[in-house]
Amino acid sequence: MSPWQPLLLVLLALGYSFAAPHQRQPTYVVFPRDLKTSNLTDTQLAEDYLYRYGYTRAAQMMGEKQSLRPALLMLQKQLSLPQTGELDSETLKAIRSPRCGVPDVGKFQTFDGDLKWHHHNITYWIQSYTEDLPRDVIDDSFARAFAVWSAVTPLTFTRVYGLEADIVIQFGVAEHGDGYPFDGKDGLLAHAFPPGPGIQGDAHFDDDELWSLGKGAVVPTYFGNANGAPCHFPFTFEGRSYLSCTTDGRNDGKPWCGTTADYDTDRKYGFCPSENLYTEHGNGDGKPCVFPFIFEGHSYSACTTKGRSDGYRWCATTANYDQDKADGFCPTRADVTVTGGNSAGEMCVFPFVFLGKQYSTCTSEGRSDGRLWCATTSNFDADKKWGFCPDQGYSLFLVAAHEFGHALGLDHSSVPEALMYPMYHYHEDSPLHEDDIKGIHHLYGRGSKPDPRPPATTAAEPQPTAPPTMCSTAPPMAYPTGGPTVAPTGAPSPGPTGPPTAGPSEAPTESSTPDDNPCNVDVFDAIADIQGALHFFKDGRYWKFSNHGGNQLQGPFLIARTWPAFPSKLNSAFEDPQPKKIFFFLWAQMWVYTGQSVLGPRSLDKLGLGSEVTLVTGLLPRRGGKALLISRERIWKFDLKSQKVDPQSVTRLDNEFSGVPWNSHNVFQYQDKAYFCHDKYFWRVSFHNRVNQVDHVAYVTYDLLQCP
């Protein structure tokens, strides 16, 4: 096998002709690419498969006659199937499953020549994106996929921005420039090249697939009372199940969704990306569409592609575009963006007419396989424009972790539970199997960090998908009023506390238990740089760590003894080094310590933040007495002297810091680099040539605290 041949993760697309009833006569809907194997018998399908993946050729080289049996035996052995030599149901099922497209070499194997990287700091560049997921979800998925391998090896993975990267990541369709074309929906999922210069080491993903986190379309939410949590599909509202966002229960036309499985019980919701909520790009300052609007003398009551050659949907943000020239692009939503059909990438239009009947949701009518589809115009009967509604999709994280294993030099495993097993299968557990670890140790040796489980993610980041090559803009901060039924509840309050009666003092706690060791802490309440030392806060205590003059760890200390006016827990802390002010945040309240005096608690709305802001994730210092105040996925400029935010400065987190988790629970700056913490991990951001770049993803305890 040539080392230049890519590893192709393949799902054999089985096509069918599907019938729709119409006056007792079936109406056939012809689906592009569905007919690739529709006329093949099981034997013909097996012959094609065995030839494509090298089994037939290998059997011939062993002197076997033209017979399926020897090749089937080899296939069944490689895939750990019962070795019958027959084309039985289990073998056919495997043939129809997602898998890599090169000959299988066996477990613990690497490419011919034992190809590997000969340096340990591997760089990668995300050259292009899919519109199926928000960009920071994609960035996070790739970072977590690399973390799978860095956790068990001495390798580190650094994101860069340019072709000099060792691993270049891109999304493409069909023939995308490397001589190994993708073949549409449910065909080749991805491929990667073995380590080496040029195209070697690169990983490509088929953009005709639906990329998700493995549980269906990812739709972020805004506002509502779910703090930006993604939609949960299906969700129940008034006893009815919904597979996509809906306007039911509202009279303003703004689509919404439940963020748990049962809105009727949990009352958690958010608003879905919609032109009735905001627009992207353009010159309309993110304002929502105004319908109807006038363009070239014609009236439009919905987003349109008129006047554009690129197919992007847009609208005017005033009633008369001809007069005001104010416009924006209409957001897309993964839950109604179709795949396949003859309108891939377009959005379902509801309601639509099919065989004279009106449909307000995706339907399986007219199909014998039960797959859900929709029209992308209001009348399928007239326009014949359609596509498949989103399914569960493929986990970008899992596929990327598999592909990056190939990019590091690993071939396939014959252990079905291994990440490097040829077939795709979704699971939520730690993806690495002992088989994978043995293989990567064979190439690069052991790592120093335990627990190879990668950081978890909460499924989606609350940003809409942006068209490629365009920078995203923030939605307007004028909030919709009211939910489908009830208003959100407020954040918990810690209760008032009095000013300190004495100056801060520091003394370690008297007892010594395993809990006194910060290396035993899974997730800290907050981390902050105070007086040049990192302070790690947890459950009313804190530790100080400094690497000046060697690594020095002190504590634990009692928060109540050092800062008597403060509650025992906090969400974030920040020191303004010039006047030596320390800001503490707990939910919707803030305290400021200056020497021996304290100001607070003050509510966050006194800072100029809206009442919907109930958490400060952290502050990052900037010049001129300013800071960036971060609350989950949003950022404001904050004046440290007046202690006010600039309400016009609000923007999305990914506009400033691409690639960090939107749901970081703590953000701080240390030694001129920003740290975004999620779970037990941190994403480190360096500031280089005015570009904020994630340069390291690692463990808080092992890498920051230097725990053994």
Swiss-Prot record:
Binding of Zn(2+) 2: at which residues?
100, 402, 406, 412
**Which cysteines share a disulfide bond?**
231-257, 245-272, 289-315, 303-330, 348-374, 362-389, 519-707
The record's PROSITE patterns line, in alphabetical order, gives:
CYSTEINE_SWITCH, FN2_1, FN2_2, HEMOPEXIN, HEMOPEXIN_2, ZINC_PROTEASE
Q: Where does Ca(2+) 2 bind?
A: 166, 198, 200, 202
Q: Which InterPro entries match?
A: FN_type2_dom, FN_type2_sf, Hemopexin-like_dom, Hemopexin-like_dom_sf, Hemopexin-like_repeat, Hemopexin_CS, Kringle-like, M10A_MMP
Q: Which cofactor does it need?
A: Zn(2+); Ca(2+)
**Region feature (Disordered):** 441-520
- The entry's Ca(2+) 3-binding residues are 183-184, 186, 188, 206, 209
Q: Can you give the propeptide residue ranges? A: 20-107
Q: Which UniProt keywords apply?
A: Calcium, Collagen degradation, Disulfide bond, Extracellular matrix, Glycoprotein, Hydrolase, Metal-binding, Metalloprotease, Protease, Repeat, Secreted, Signal, Zinc, Zymogen
Binding residues for Zn(2+) 1: 176, 178, 191, 204
Name of this protein: Matrix metalloproteinase-9
- Organism equals Rattus norvegicus (Rat)
Q: Gene name on record?
A: Mmp9
